[in-house]
């Protein structure tokens, strides 16, 4: 958990050079309720259609949606589909499209007809020329790669066998990358893994792996054995076999094979899941992840992708929610930063008829006195909001040596308590603004205050609420704890 969190800030600093076969994906959704009288074929009553960037372009979209920068090099025809792809990719501020135009071939376009009700693909129609790029076009692609390579942190080759990744382009890209100390990830299509010799990582799916190794790949042990032989052929550091519902198996040259099971999710569409895996691996490895962290992140990314319709991209927030423990996320979601929006929470709770309570404090070092007040406050309401003084507010109230813990740490400790439903950080000296916004049914403070001394008591009373004073536990205060710690006492 902590490793992923530590790596996340580095992701926006990474740049991935992605090279591969670009496609325009179109999805036609409709209802199927009858068979054609002209032939034994279902009739789809088309209701809507969507277009998206597919193939290696979807890898680029995933890289950008994760927050990294991507320079994408691909091939299009001189047609509407190619212009649509150029325009669509250019709209993403994190993607720099470098597209070579070949008027002699159409832009690869795939149209899928999908039953809306059953989320079932009925038919796919392809417009494409899968032949390798001509020598002249190939040279343009290679020139583009060599120009962009020095600025990249990692290289990703996405091979759909549509003509971009010729043997010469692959060879020149890998050789140039190795000279510059850049790692190269290849999502291969050819069963001849020797084409990708010298790459850092190959990511075939199970079918591709079986074809390349002539292995049944029925177990992690069998995959590991066949993978090591394939790694000798490809002279690569690692090989990852994606296996859909079976999960993923990573074999590294130095170390044991690692298998991770697939996340249990409802599969809506597998289109582009492999693109997501490749993108997550590239971004995580570029950011400094080790093999294990990168593998688990890619596995989580695949789970998010297959739970979406169409050609899916995965955001860093979605990846984070899938990777991090539920309890960690649940606590984090309880925290509202200073100036944040409380309205959605308040509206939801009021719609349910919940009695909302409020208390506040600095909570610099949580102690039994705090816990008693919070527990009693929660017992007096259905949902408890805790107002938390920001670091600046604490310094003004307690002096320059406080707080001992910053506001984020204090908020996370409070949010982890079952008694607390929401933590709202405020910058002012008092929580009057928060109380005025929340209008709690019950306002709770420790018993060392009188009712008239409690900030916001007038607001609460004017709205029909009550002020509840809780007897404090003697001998417990943050100030005394800090003083005792400074004096070396326990």
Swiss-Prot record:
Domain of life the protein comes from: Bacteria
Region Cytidylyltransferase, annotated ranges: 358-490
GO molecular function: ATP binding; heptose 7-phosphate kinase activity; heptose-1-phosphate adenylyltransferase activity; phosphotransferase activity, alcohol group as acceptor
Record keyword DNA-binding present: no
Gene3D superfamilies in alphabetical order: 3.40.1190.20, HUPs
Quaternary structure and interacting proteins, as annotated: Homodimer.
Protein name in UniProt: Bifunctional protein HldE
Organism of derivation: Rhodopseudomonas palustris (strain BisA53)
UniProt lineage: Bacteria, Pseudomonadati, Pseudomonadota, Alphaproteobacteria, Hyphomicrobiales
């Amino acid at each position: 958990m902590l490793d992923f969190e530590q790596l996340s800030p580095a992701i926006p600093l990474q740049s991935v050079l992605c090279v591969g076969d670009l496609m325009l994906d179109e999805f036609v959704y409709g209802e199927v309720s009858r068979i054609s009288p002209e032939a034994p074929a279902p009739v789809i009553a088309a209701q809507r259609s969507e277009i998206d960037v597919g193939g290696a372009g979807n890898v680029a979209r995933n890289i950008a949606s994760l927050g990294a920068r991507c320079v994408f090099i691909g091939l299009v025809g001189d047609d509407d589909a190619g212009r649509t792809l150029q325009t669509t990719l250019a709209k993403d501020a994190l993607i720099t499209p470098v597209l070579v135009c070949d008027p002699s071939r159409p832009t690869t376009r795939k149209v899928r007809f999908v039953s809306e009700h059953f989320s079932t693909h009925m038919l796919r129609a392809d417009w494409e020329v899968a032949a390798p790029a001509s020598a002249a076009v190939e040279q343009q692609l290679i020139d583009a790669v060599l120009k962009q390579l020095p600025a990249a942190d990692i290289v990703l080759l996405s091979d759909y066998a549509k003509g971009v990744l010729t043997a010469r382009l692959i060879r020149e890209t890998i050789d140039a990358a190795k000279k510059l100390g850049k790692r190269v990830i290849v999502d291969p299509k050819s069963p001849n893994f020797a084409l990708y010799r010298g790459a850092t990582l190959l990511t075939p799916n199970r079918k591709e792996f079986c074809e390349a190794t002539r292995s049944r790949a029925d177990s992690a042990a069998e995959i590991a054995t066949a993978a090591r032989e394939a790694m000798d052929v490809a002279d690569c550091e690692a090989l990852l076999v994606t296996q859909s519902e079976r999960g993923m198996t990573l074999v590294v040259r130095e170390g044991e094979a690692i298998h991770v099971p697939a996340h249990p999710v409802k599969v809506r569409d597998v289109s582009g899941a492999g693109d997501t895996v490749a993108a997550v691996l590239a971004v995580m490895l570029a950011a400094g992840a080790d093999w294990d962290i990168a593998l688990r992140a890619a596995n989580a990314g695949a789970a998010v992708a297959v739970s979406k319709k169409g050609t899916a991209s995965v955001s860093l927030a979605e990846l984070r929610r899938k990777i991090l423990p539920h309890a960690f996320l649940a606590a984090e979601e309880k925290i509202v930063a200073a100036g944040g929006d409380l309205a959605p929470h308040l509206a939801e709770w009021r719609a349910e008829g919940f009695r909302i309570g409020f208390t506040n404090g600095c909570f610099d070092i949580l102690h039994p006195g705090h816990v008693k007040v919070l527990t009693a406050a929660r017992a007096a309401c259905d949902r408890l909001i805790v107002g938390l003084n920001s670091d600046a507010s604490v310094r003004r109230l307690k002096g320059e040596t406080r707080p001992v813990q910053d506001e984020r740490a204090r908020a996370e400790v409070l949010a982890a308590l079952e008694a607390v439903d929401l933590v709202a950080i405020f910058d002012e000296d008092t929580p009057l603004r928060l109380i005025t916004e929340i209008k709690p049914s019950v306002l709770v403070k420790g018993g060392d205050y009188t009712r008239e001394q409690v900030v916001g008591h007038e607001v609460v009373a004017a709205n029909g609420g009550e002020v509840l004073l809780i007897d404090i536990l003697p001998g417990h205060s943050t100030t005394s704890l800090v003083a005792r710690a400074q004096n070396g006492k326990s």
